[in-house]
Curated annotation (Swiss-Prot):
It catalyses: glycolate(in) + H(+)(in) = glycolate(out) + H(+)(out); (S)-lactate(in) + H(+)(in) = (S)-lactate(out) + H(+)(out); (R)-lactate(in) + H(+)(in) = (R)-lactate(out) + H(+)(out). Keywords: Cell inner membrane, Cell membrane, Membrane, Symport, Transmembrane, Transmembrane helix, Transport. This is Glycolate permease GlcA. Inhibited by the proton ionophore carbonyl cyanide m-chlorophenylhydrazone (CCCP). Disruption phenotype: The glcA-lldP double mutant is unable to grow on glycolate and displays undetectable glycolate uptake when grown in the presence of glycolate. InterPro entries: Lactate_perm. The lineage of its organism: Bacteria, Pseudomonadati, Pseudomonadota, Gammaproteobacteria, Enterobacterales. Disulfide bonds: none annotated. Residues 1-13, 63-69, 152-158, 221-225, 270-313, 400-408, 460-536 are cytoplasmic.
Amino acid sequence: MVTWTQMYMPMGGLGLSALVALIPIIFFFVALAVLRLKGHVAGAITLILSILIAIFAFKMPIDMAFAAAGYGFIYGLWPIAWIIVAAVFLYKLTVASGQFDIIRSSVISITDDQRLQVLLIGFSFGALLEGAAGFGAPVAITGALLVGLGFKPLYAAGLCLIANTAPVAFGALGVPILVAGQVTGIDPFHIGAMAGRQLPFLSVLVPFWLVAMMDGWKGVKETWPAALVAGGSFAVTQFFTSNYIGPELPDITSALVSIVSLALFLKVWRPKNTETAISMGQSAGAMVVNKPSSGGPVPSEYSLGQIIRAWSPFLILTVLVTIWTMKPFKALFAPGGAFYSLVINFQIPHLHQQVLKAAPIVAQPTPMDAVFKFDPLSAGGTAIFIAAIISIFILGVGIKKGIGVFAETLISLKWPILSIGMVLAFAFVTNYSGMSTTLALVLAGTGVMFPFFSPFLGWLGVFLTGSDTSSNALFGSLQSTTAQQINVSDTLLVAANTSGGVTGKMISPQSIAVACAATGMVGRESELFRYTVKHSLIFASVIGIITLLQAYVFTGMLVS
């Protein structure tokens, strides 16, 4: 078997090598933010650039470069695109059945103020979905819900991407934290506890930030009590759950407490002016809210039973994806499990264990696995799809109409699915060629200032892979090693990789493609990217400052 060892300074120096490795990433930013190319076009050109640089600059064998691209593309189709197809299918069923009118009415009965609807649906309910499912489903579902409530697609997608910042680190029952523990050897409980001492600051900030994006300082002054209830209840619960229970449940508990607290609060309080129609403002790119009124929420004309039936697809989804991510269920499909025979593991030819990581990332050359797992029953998307099938019968859609809705879903998602495949192919080429490691080593070389840049490493990882879990797998060990070299807590920097990663989710090409697909913005990925990029950089800087202060000033906040 022919092997190839990654080269991290192929141009002779780390700085120049990093500049070359940056070319595909810079092009992707420019393609979306300046050239305004469609997502699948930008992704395809970026993929071609990354393959050429991998082969000619980083000396990756041609067959391995194309194998990495192929592996990334099929990974984009399964499990990522499958999750999105199932989530959008579920939403479209509620619309086709006419039940979304009841969902809309039930939300308006709590508040008809769109600023508060974003907090309730985008922030709190989205966090619940992130805790249970993760991997794109929360943004797809909450974005579609907000469009159904009357939000313009760009705002629905952008606001949900930014709202999804707070819960990502503990998503899918703590998988990102658990993976960080696996690759570093640090107790996941300690990593989760440390992240739980960083992210609550962001959790409090995000609701205020969302309102400010929609209605400026005026909106914050009018709605600050509700924003404080939503963010404060989430942050406090997030801290206590992560520090005293474990990394698996912070999103579930925080989201439930936030939803209940905000819903109950809105029963006894409402802003002086209720804002019900959002449009883009003329100054500072702010979102200004029109049609002020003080009429308050409109009582629902539907019974409790009708409301529960309308919401049942999302209730079933939450229950099923929670079951799907629990250890006993996963054990059924693990080696030795009762249903392991239903899982197909395919070793990627010309790639599996043929690419070797090298020092300083690892002590000795270590082969990288490349195994595609096709798990038709245990995949998260299947849980959502089963929820959709059950919903066909509960909502009375009918099998024939349900099949038609599914076909319509596939047709509407053809370009987003291609975009997802392309960006994952680019990400995998970047990873297997060593380009991502070269960029990481540049950041790691910042010495005593590295605690500030540490979250940006997680940010970069999530931008490249679309996943906080993958970012931790990619850079977790580098964070730990660098921490020991500069005499800083390794638990702090590994947690910072996770915390910083959440701020990159809103600009990840994968997330952008998912949000556009769910809100009917196919081909408008550049608009959404330009809408979220500055917020991503600001949030990453906030986490960087928090990490720097915890490393050298507020050392009492460290997990001992």
